[in-house]
């Protein structure tokens, strides 16, 4: 998406998207499905153990995607639960909430965020386990963009030198990362 909409290179964007989808399919339906049988037995639903975490939305990929389109109220109600809303501060606090000021970078993590927040497995939306690790690079990139934006805006509003404002933004980030 970034290559298509920001860089405006549709060929590269399509190539990266295709490679990503192919890798997702191989990893999810091949590698993980094969090795999950060692630990869970033959419990895969339509090819992947992960679909069991979305049975409240449907039994497989098609029915899950259909639920997202045909039952938006139920999906939004799920996303608005206290446990899932608590996920956001756990993801944003380590970067001083600055990623909220870099929404494009954070939006690139939408598939990962959706997978975590729509699951019925609490470890995926707790923000405390490895499931959230894939969001970290996007949160950091969003924080960098957010810090740059905030530095420019505060310097313009106050007339302070950018270096002074940036030092304050860095102190803010450091305080939140401790």
Listing of model-derived features with the role each one plays in the protein:
Residues 1:
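Conserved acidic functional residues
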Residues 107-156, 168:
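Hydrophobic/aromatic-rich transmembrane helices and adjacent perimembrane loops
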